[in-house]
């Protein structure tokens, strides 16, 4: 094959590469078949020829190198054909390398040799080349010509694996020549030798073999070379060798302990100095070359990695930290990174802080953190935060790090931005830095930046909330999904733990500042400004943040996993919050208890703290429970707070017992139930368990099975009794409560347990100390006769003292059975229904309790009696009433200002009202009547609170009994001249009262009582011991011209006047006197005396006006009075009666009353009014035709839908129409007859007593009495 066979092989290339005169003799196999068509045989002949120009040789070598790069495998096959040819070619190139002075030619030869020897199966060639290099160095008289050889060796060792070891083992004496090169005054040679040394020491095996060489010969020489290096190549290669040396502890120790003298170059007179590695590296740090600065930083880091404790001091004494801090302001990320690494390791040495390097450098660190936030290199940001954290953590407390509040604020802002980073690693490192930052000595620069600290915590918690709510990717299946989920949970737990540690340190900071008056608030805040930058505001924020963020995050995480360390930090936060805001500790403790934190803490102790494991968690749990229990007991919601002495006792057994409680609930119950002999320490643990269960139940955390707890508490109490022990009151309280709330209807206590309870309670001076306000506890004490007889009175008193005063709002006028009562009241009612005898205890409470408690008892009794119509209580408690009333009267004597007396009288009147049928008044009732009348006689009209219920009772007593008893009762009351005198005063007060006043209901009762007394005296011809004087003109004036008088008072006066009219003003009891001497003006006045005709007409107009008001009760009273008036007039002058009944205004009145719609005439008062008009033949008021229309309407009405009052009034109207013969029409007569027959076939039973008697505005009223 010739060059012509290759079209791409040009003539010029052939002339350059081939020896034409000899190439034809060469075997074609030495010719590369692709471009460039190098003939190796030609190259071997051309390169050694001295007559060939260097340019041509260089071109040949370049083409061979190009072919080696482009067609590596082909060239490898080419040279591998004959090993001898290959070795010869290597020797030719090596000879050319050492013979030429052209640096580029030398570099080209080195590159070809290196590339060629890296081909497969070149071991013999490599060995040959090593021998050539060894021979060359040994034969050199001066190391000045060793540059090419040493450079080649360095490249070969770097490229060929294992060559360094082989070179050291087989050519060890080369090291002596290399030492000669280091002292040769040529930095190029020195640089190549350092490069070679660096590659040799990069091999651990070679480094071990060369350790003695370094220790004895190279160390000092190298350090001197490093110090004196001027060219960048030598500096970089020296630093490269240093990096390799610093990988090994031995060389680090040797070089760090070595110092070498260096002569001054500036002046002959200048004495020589000694240098060391820290000083040399400091010089590189001071250079303006970034590469050297970075390399120097790397070397410092490499030294410190081995042992900061051994070597950091030397660097600190060399002031290295100062310059590292300066480099933090560099724009080079790699330089800042390197400086961070050095400073992190230097921070492990206390001298780093005692020489105040951190004080001078902290500002640079903060600025660097602020600058790194603008970079995209998150690892750099993380490393800076790590350095900041190390400084903050290790800084001695006595050396203040932040010398101004402004710098502290800048640091806080930098951390705030860092923790808000979306990169998890940055945020996590920022959390650790924040924990270290929140230290008292770091925040003591006044004024304390509470606002900045709050912003920092807000950012920290917000970032944690955001991360904790990140959903897990569950799309993958199987074990991979499980592993990913576990890793994600661990990451969340670690992040949350760091957050909680930071928050805990903030809480600790707040506690420590409480004792610092100067740290309470910012003195530079304007007085009118809002006090946000204060310790108090910061402390309140901590509590709020824990409540709204920390607790929810921990609870959510605990659903996935439970980390002991995390829970330890969390509980320590809760514990510290009790101290931070003392005035909120009780409220906070209640909220924690309501959120099941007692259960949570006990479960943690049971799970992790059994035996001696997690002792720190056990301590934190015990301390948290201790303070929470004391807080709950010191200001409980439903029971009396403990005395200081009791708190001390509780504190003692909690302190001793809580650390030893680490059992699960079943084990705790079994421990509590142990009936064997119990030692003092064990008993304290039982007290602790019982108290924890009690507080948990109080706050509705019922994690203990109630049936099992019920049995365990009984066993516990019997154990105490067996050993003759008397438990502390708080233990009794807990036991009673748990027995009450855990027992059901079917689980009754054994008599032995009841006996033990009674014995324990009798040893307690006041049940207030063991009472817990709960309906089940009330039922517990009242369900067992042995407890009720001894403690029922006091328990009920405590019950009402704890009840809220909201019973006054209960509507006792509502229909029974329809009112929805509060839970506690409903529970009490159930107890009263099951045991009515408890009502006697309640009556005693009315007498013996404070006014507020007695009022609650009264309301409860009133509502209970109103709601429970089937409970017969009159006979049960009437005797009790008499005894209590007598005791009150004896106690207060002539005074009527007893606070409970009105309440008792109210209840007495209510019980009287609850009588459903007429009953004979027995001796007990008569005595009560006598006592009440005596009491009224001692009162003045101002005693409204006593007189009103008393008058109600007297009124009901007269109207709720049989006629014979009414006569006896009236005789008793009429014998009380003091009562009659009081009534006279009350009646006279009517004319002085203006409008509606608080005394108006009492005046109404007085008029009704007077009317009743007058009727009973007149009907029974009873003896009168004192008369009542009433001004008739005032009565008529009040009714004729009513001015803002209440409807009830008007009805009462009407009833009085009606009684007087019915008696024709001849009552022996009531004397109606005129206002003054008024001569009779006409004969009619004489006939009507003591009334005058004008008064009659004025009274008629007044009655009409009152009827128009359409008040049902007032209307009935008006009609009754009108009936009595017309009867009175008819008896004296029928013409005047007819004239009064036929007044035109009566027709207008009638039609005014009938405008209420269809069948509006079917109202009792209207029917009675029409009956009067028919009776007195007032055709001008009600014509025959209109009567017929009324009859037609009545015939069509469903009688079953009408009330008894209406039916009776309708029956009276029809009878009156029939008797007057007003109907001439046969059809109408039949209609009338049919209606009468329909009514006669029906019976008109008397209205039930409890429906007849009303309580209107506090006034007892009998509808039958008003209606007449």
Swiss-Prot record:
GO terms for biological process: gamete generation; male meiosis I; meiotic cell cycle; meiotic spindle organization; meiotic telomere clustering; oogenesis; polar body extrusion after meiotic divisions; spermatid development. InterPro entries: ARM-type_fold, Immune_Signaling-Apoptosis_Reg. Transmembrane segments: none annotated. Disruption phenotype: Mice are infertile due to meiotic arrest caused by defects in chromosome synapsis. They lack zygotene Rad51 foci, and are likely to be deficient in meiotic double-strand break (DSB) formation. In addition, mutant spermatocytes exhibit meiotic arrest at entry into pachynema, whereas oocytes progress to an abnormal metaphase I. MEI1-deficient oocytes are capable of fertilization. The zygotes are capable of initiating embryonic development but mostly arrest at the 2-4 cell stage. Among all the zygotes, approximately 5% are androgenetic and do not contain maternal chromosomes. Strongly expressed in testis, weakly in brain, and not detected in spleen, liver, kidney, small intestine or colon. Disulfide bonds: none annotated. Required for normal meiotic chromosome synapsis. May be involved in the formation of meiotic double-strand breaks (DSBs) in spermatocytes. This is Meiosis inhibitor protein 1. The gene is Mei1.
């Amino acid at each position: 094959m010739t060059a012509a066979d290759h079209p791409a092989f040009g003539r010029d290339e052939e002339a350059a590469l081939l020896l034409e005169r000899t190439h034809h003799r060469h075997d074609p196999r030495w010719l590369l078949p692709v471009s460039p068509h190098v003939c190796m045989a030609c190259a071997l002949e051309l390169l050694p020829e001295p007559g060939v120009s260097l340019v041509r040789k260089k071109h040949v070598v370049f083409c061979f190198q190009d072919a080696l790069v482009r067609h590596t495998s082909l060239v490898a096959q080419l040279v591998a054909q004959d090993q001898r040819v290959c070795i010869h070619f290597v020797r030719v190139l090596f000879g050319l390398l050492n013979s030429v002075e052209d640096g580029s030619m030398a570099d080209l030869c080195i590159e070809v040799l290196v590339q060629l020897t890296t081909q497969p199966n070149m071991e013999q060639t490599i060995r040959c080349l090593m021998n050539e290099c060894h021979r060359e160095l040994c034969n050199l008289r001066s190391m000045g010509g060793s540059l090419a050889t040493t450079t080649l060796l360095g490249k070969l060792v770097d490229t060929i694996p294992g060559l360094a070891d082989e070179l050291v083992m087989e050519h060890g004496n080369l090291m002596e020549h290399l030492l000669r090169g280091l002292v040769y005054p040529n930095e190029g040679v020195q640089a190549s030798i350092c490069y070679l040394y660096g590659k040799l020491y990069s091999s651990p095996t070679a480094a071990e073999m060369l350790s003695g060489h370094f220790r004895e010969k190279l160390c000092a020489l190298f350090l001197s070379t490093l110090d004196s290096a001027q060219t960048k190549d030598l500096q970089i290669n020296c630093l490269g060798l240093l990096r390799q040396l610093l990988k090994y502890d031995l060389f680090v120790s040797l070089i760090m302990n070595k110092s070498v003298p260096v002569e001054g170059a500036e002046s002959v007179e200048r004495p020589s100095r000694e240098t060391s590695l820290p000083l040399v590296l400091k010089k590189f740090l001071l250079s303006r070359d970034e590469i050297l600065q970075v390399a120097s930083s790397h070397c410092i880091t490499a030294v410190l990695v081995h042992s900061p404790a051994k070597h950091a001091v030397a660097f600190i004494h060399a002031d290295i930290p100062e310059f590292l801090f300066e480099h933090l302001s560099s724009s080079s990320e790699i330089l800042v990174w390197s400086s961070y690494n050095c400073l992190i390791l230097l921070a492990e040495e206390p001298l780093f802080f005692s020489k105040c390097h951190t004080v001078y450098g902290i500002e640079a660190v903060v600025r660097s953190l602020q600058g790194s936030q603008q970079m995209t290199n998150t690892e750099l940001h993380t490393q800076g935060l790590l350095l900041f954290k190390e400084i903050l953590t290790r800084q001695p407390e006595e050396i203040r790090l932040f010398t101004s509040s402004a710098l502290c604020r800048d640091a806080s802002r930098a951390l705030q931005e860092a923790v808000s980073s979306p990169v998890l690693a940055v945020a996590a490192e920022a959390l650790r830095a924040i924990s270290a930052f929140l230290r008292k000595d770091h925040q003591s620069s006044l004024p304390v930046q509470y606002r900045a600290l709050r912003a920092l915590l807000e950012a920290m918690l917000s970032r944690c909330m955001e991360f904790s709510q990140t959903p897990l990717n569950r799309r993958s299946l199987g074990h991979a999904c499980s592993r990913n989920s576990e890793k994600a949970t661990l990451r969340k737990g670690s992040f949350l733990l760091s957050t909680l540690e930071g928050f805990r340190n903030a809480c600790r900071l707040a506690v420590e500042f409480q004792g610092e008056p100067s740290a309470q608030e910012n003195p530079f805040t304007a007085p009118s400004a809002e006090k946000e930058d204060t310790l108090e505001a910061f402390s309140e924020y901590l509590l709020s943040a824990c409540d709204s963020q920390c607790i929810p995050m921990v609870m959510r995480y605990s659903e996935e996993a439970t980390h002991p360390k995390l829970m330890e930090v969390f509980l320590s936060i809760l514990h510290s919050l009790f101290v931070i805001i003392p005035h909120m500790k009780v409220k906070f403790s209640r909220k924690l208890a309501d959120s099941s934190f007692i259960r949570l803490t006990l479960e943690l102790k049971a799970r992790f703290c059994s035996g001696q494991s997690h002792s720190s968690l056990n301590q934190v749990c015990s301390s948290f429970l201790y303070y929470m229990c004391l807080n709950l007991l010191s200001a409980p919601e439903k029971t009396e707070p403990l005395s200081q002495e009791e708190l001390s006792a509780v504190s003692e057994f909690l302190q001793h017992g809580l650390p030893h409680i680490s059992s699960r609930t079943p084990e705790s119950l079994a421990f509590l139930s142990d009936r064997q002999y119990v030692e003092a320490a064990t008993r304290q643990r039982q007290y602790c368990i019982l108290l924890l269960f009690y507080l948990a139940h109080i706050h509705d955390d019922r994690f203990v099975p109630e049936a099992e707890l019920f049995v365990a508490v009984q066993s516990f109490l019997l154990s105490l009794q067996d050993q003759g022990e008397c438990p502390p009151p708080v233990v009794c309280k807990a036991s009673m409560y748990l027995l009450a709330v855990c027992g059901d209807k079917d689980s009754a206590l054994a008599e032995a347990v009841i006996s033990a309870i009674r014995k324990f309670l009798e040893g307690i001076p006041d049940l207030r100390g063991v009472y817990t306000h709960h309906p089940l506890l009330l039922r517990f004490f009242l369900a067992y006769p042995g407890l009720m007889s001894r403690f029922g009175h006091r328990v009920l008193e405590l019950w009402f003292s704890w009840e809220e005063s909201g019973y006054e709002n209960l509507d006792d006028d509502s229909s029974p059975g329809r009112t929805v009562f509060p839970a506690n009241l409903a529970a009490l009612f159930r107890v009263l229904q099951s045991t009515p005898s408890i009502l006697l205890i309640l009556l005693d409470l009315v007498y013996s309790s404070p006014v507020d408690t007695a009022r609650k008892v009264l309301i409860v009794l009133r509502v209970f009696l109103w709601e429970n119509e089937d409970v017969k209580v009159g006979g049960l408690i009437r005797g009790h009433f008499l005894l209590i009333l007598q005791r009150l009267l004896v106690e207060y004597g002539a005074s009527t200002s007893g606070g409970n007396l009105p309440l008792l009288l109210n209840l007495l009147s209510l019980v009287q009202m609850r009588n459903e049928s007429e009953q004979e008044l027995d001796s007990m009732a008569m005595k009560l009547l006598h006592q009440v009348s005596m009491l009224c006689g001692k009162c003045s009209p101002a005693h409204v609170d006593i007189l009103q219920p008393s008058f109600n009772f007297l009124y009901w007593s007269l109207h709720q009994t049989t006629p014979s008893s009414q006569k006896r009762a009236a005789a008793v009351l009429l014998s009380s001249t003091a009562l009659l005198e009081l009534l006279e005063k009350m009646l006279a007060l009517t004319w002085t009262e203006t409008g509606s006043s608080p005394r108006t209901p009492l005046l109404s009762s007085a008029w009704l009582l007077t009317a009743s007394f007058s009727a009973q005296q007149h009907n029974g011809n009873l003896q009168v011991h004192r008369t009542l004087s009433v001004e008739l003109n005032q009565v008529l004036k009040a009714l004729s011209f009513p001015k803002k008088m209440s409807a009830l008072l008007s009805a009462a006066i009407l009833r009085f006047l009606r009684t007087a009219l019915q008696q024709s003003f001849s009552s022996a009891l009531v004397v109606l006197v005129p206002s003054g001497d008024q001569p009779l003006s006409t004969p009619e006045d004489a006939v009507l005396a003591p009334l005058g005709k004008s008064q009659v007409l004025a009274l008629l107009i007044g009655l009409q006006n009152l009827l128009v008001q359409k008040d049902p009760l007032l209307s009935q009273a008006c009609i009754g009075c009108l009936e009595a008036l017309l009867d009175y007039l008819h008896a004296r002058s029928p013409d005047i009666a007819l004239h009064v009944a036929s007044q035109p205004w009566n027709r207008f009145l009638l039609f005014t009353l009938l405008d209420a719609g269809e069948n509006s005439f079917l109202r009792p008062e209207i029917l009675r009014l029409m009956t009067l008009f028919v009776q007195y033949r007032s055709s001008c008021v009600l014509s025959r035709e209109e009567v017929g229309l009324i009859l037609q309407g009545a015939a069509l009405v469903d009688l079953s839908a009408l009330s008894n009052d209406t039916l009776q009034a309708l029956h009276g109207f029809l009878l009156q129409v029939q008797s007057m013969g007003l109907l001439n029409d046969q059809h109408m007569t039949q209609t009338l007859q049919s209606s009468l027959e329909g009514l006669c076939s029906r019976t008109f039973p008397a209205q039930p007593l409890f429906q007849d008697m009303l309580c209107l505005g506090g006034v007892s009223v009998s509808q039958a009495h008003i209606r007449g």
